[in-house]
């Protein structure tokens, strides 16, 4: 039983003022519900001497309030003076936060608290309203973590930009009792920052491959049915989608899938397609998004009549072998685009856009949302190794490529099992896919009122899904035959195709020119800074000279930033480069120089980093120019074949 603490009317007013300023609605509600507390307020002679006694075990929040406050302040004003974001576990008496926020360098302090009675008491004693209102002080309750809260925190500014210097500080020894919660939270934040970094793109070469293959695939995309056509003819014609993945649990679900195939829309992964063909279960859609030639091999086959009425939906980045194999047997395919700056620059809006996630299962899930299904049923979505160490179902064609993976990953990525049956072994990639999936499932429920049923009956738990046997889903969700085959999808008229082919040619040709113009201008800025830097190292420590170089660097960075608005076609390859650079630069930014020599060395380091970055920018834009020149050829051939040469000439002039 908590202590009935008597607060004065002024203190109650203060509590309400703090509550009003809180932006975290769930926390606000929880704090309003508290009527008493196990904590006793202990006030010393000094204004800052505010302690709490936990009457359940007679322990104190602080052993010595003033000493601990001073020691923390000294550490933070020395080592972490320039940190834009600080993270604490435990609210304590809150005085440390008020003191630290006097420093304008600290833009935000994020506080995680498990025992919110502490906040309840302190909110009656001290005024945090302005810090809370401006969001410089942010409080999260670790008992009610919202998946979205953490994702948003870890992917937004400035938290994301400074994620490489993230660390979590315990407010006081009292909080060591929650060590499991602390470890869990820390693991979650580190993982969310990693996911965020990956979603920003961590590899410019990956982006380059995407651009190359997208440009190469343009003629195929424009001459086949569009995404707009798919939505206009197929949206809302079925309530339940079944998504078929290739996990070890798939085999046992195939007989039921065959029995109920006519009553649901079946989406399947490229890897499950040959398996369904073998069992003569016709999917409605087969999706593929990988850029590698190995994935194209799932289509290096001929299932004859079986393929009639299946629509193959490909991300417009796929390896050209994929379309080559599909064309060989006259299969119906379409290329669909995701949001990406080079793709958006071409403005071929009929052929996009939807976000496709990291894996083909995510892509299936997201397409099922856009086609307005009310229920989404997952099967074969293990995202974990089977007990015998198998990574996929036994019919999977690339099983040999995963040999030894179970041993490699053992005990590194364990996670909660489906049906709460203990733990299962997962992998780095599956963990990433699972987190991605959990975000999608939460989003589908919140924004589209879609229910996701995980009927895998094995593998890893996917938070947010309802776990049910596949038989239950079939009997309860699938009651009538759908009108299959669905309406046929048609390509655009020949005139419209020609218009888009020319438009695409014009845009790609312009982008080659953008690369050249940018490189020529950029190399001049680079040489100027490089020469100044060489002179600087030979001169005496010249502060004015350093400032001039840093100003030149800032101008050049502004030049790159402006591309976001003026030349989006260059940002797809520069985006990941810029992200990785900024994340690493944060480590130099927060160095706190104590002497003149320290300050000089910090500036030298800052300039060196930027020079290396500029060399990379130049190299990548050159690589894009060459890639476009090489991959525009299929587009040129298609235009010649359609006797549009003279228009091509006009574009080139």
Explain the meaning of each model-derived region.
Residues 106, 283, 373-376:
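Proline-aspartate-enriched helix->loop->beta-strand connector
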Residues 320-379, 383:
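Active-site/ligand-binding-proximal alpha/beta "capping" segment
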Residues 355, 364-442, 448-449, 455-472:
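Catalytic cores of enzyme domains
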Residues 245, 276, 378-380:
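Short, conserved catalytic/metal-binding motifs centered on acidic residues
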Residues 244, 260-263, 267, 289, ...:
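Alpha-helix capping and helix-loop boundary segments enriched in small/acidic/polar residues
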Residues 112-114, 142, 269, 289, ...:
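Generic beta-sheet signal
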């Amino acid at each position: 039983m908590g202590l009935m603490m008597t607060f004065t009317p002024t203190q109650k007013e203060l509590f309400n003022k703090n509550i009003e300023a809180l932006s975290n609605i769930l926390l606000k509600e929880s704090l309003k519900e508290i009527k008493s507390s196990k904590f006793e307020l202990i006030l010393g002679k000094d204004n800052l001497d505010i302690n709490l006694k936990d009457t359940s075990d007679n322990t104190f929040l602080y052993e010595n309030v003033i000493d601990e406050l001073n020691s923390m302040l000294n550490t933070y004003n020395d080592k972490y003076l320039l940190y834009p974001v600080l993270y604490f576990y435990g609210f304590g008496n809150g005085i440390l936060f008020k003191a630290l926020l006097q420093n304008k360098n600290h833009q935000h302090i994020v506080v995680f608290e498990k025992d919110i009675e502490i906040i309840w008491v302190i909110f009656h004693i001290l005024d945090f309203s302005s810090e809370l209102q401006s969001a410089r002080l942010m409080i999260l309750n670790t008992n009610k973590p919202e998946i979205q809260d953490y994702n948003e925190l870890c992917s937004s500014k400035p938290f994301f930009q400074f994620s490489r210097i993230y660390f979590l500080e315990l407010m006081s020894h009292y909080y060591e009792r929650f060590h499991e919660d602390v470890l869990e939270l820390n693991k979650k934040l580190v993982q969310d920052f990693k996911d965020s970094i990956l979603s920003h793109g961590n590899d410019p070469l990956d982006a380059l491959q995407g651009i190359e293959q997208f440009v190469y695939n343009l003629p195929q995309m424009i001459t086949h049915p569009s995404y707009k056509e798919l939505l206009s003819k197929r949206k809302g014609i079925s309530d339940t989608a079944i998504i078929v993945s290739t996990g070890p649990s798939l085999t046992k679900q195939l007989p039921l899938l065959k029995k109920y195939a006519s009553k649901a829309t079946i989406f399947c992964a490229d890897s499950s397609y040959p398996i369904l063909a073998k069992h003569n279960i016709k999917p409605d859609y087969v999706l593929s998004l990988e850029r590698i030639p190995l994935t194209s091999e799932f289509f290096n086959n001929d299932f004859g009549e079986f393929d009639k009425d299946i629509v193959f939906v490909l991300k417009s980045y796929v390896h050209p072998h994929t379309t080559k194999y599909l064309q060989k047997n006259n299969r119906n395919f379409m290329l669909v685009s995701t949001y990406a700056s080079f793709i958006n620059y071409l403005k071929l809006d009929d052929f996009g856009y939807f976000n496709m996630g990291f894996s083909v299962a995510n892509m299936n899930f997201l397409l099922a949302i856009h086609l307005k299904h009310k229920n989404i049923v997952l099967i074969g979505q293990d995202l974990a190794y089977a007990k015998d160490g198998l990574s996929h179902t036994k019919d999977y064609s690339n099983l040999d490529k995963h040999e030894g993976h179970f041993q490699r990953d053992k005990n590194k990525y364990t996670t909660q099992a489906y049906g709460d049956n203990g733990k299962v072994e997962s992998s780095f990639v599956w963990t990433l896919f699972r987190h991605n999936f959990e975000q999608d499932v939460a989003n589908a429920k919140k924004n589209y009122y879609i229910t996701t049923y995980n009927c895998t009956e094995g593998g890893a738990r996917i938070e947010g899904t309802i776990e049910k046997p596949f038989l239950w889903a079939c009997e309860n969700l699938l009651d009538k035959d759908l009108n299959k085959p669905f309406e046929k999808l048609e390509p655009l008229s020949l005139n419209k195709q020609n218009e888009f082919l020319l438009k695409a040619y014009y845009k790609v040709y312009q982008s080659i020119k953008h690369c050249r113009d940018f490189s020529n201008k950029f190399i001049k800025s680079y040489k100027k800074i490089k020469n100044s830097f060489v002179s600087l190292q030979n001169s005496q420590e010249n502060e004015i000279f350093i400032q001039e170089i840093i100003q030149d660097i800032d101008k050049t960075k502004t030049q790159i930033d402006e591309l976001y608005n003026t030349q989006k076609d260059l940002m797809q390859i520069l985006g990941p480069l810029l992200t990785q650079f900024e994340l690493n630069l944060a480590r130099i930014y927060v160095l706190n120089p104590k002497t003149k020599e320290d300050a000089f060395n910090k500036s030298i380091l800052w300039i060196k980093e930027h020079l290396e970055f500029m060399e990379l920018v130049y190299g990548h834009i050159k690589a894009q120019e060459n890639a476009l020149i090489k991959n525009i050829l299929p587009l040129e051939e298609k235009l010649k074949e359609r006797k549009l040469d003279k228009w091509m000439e006009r574009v080139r002039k």
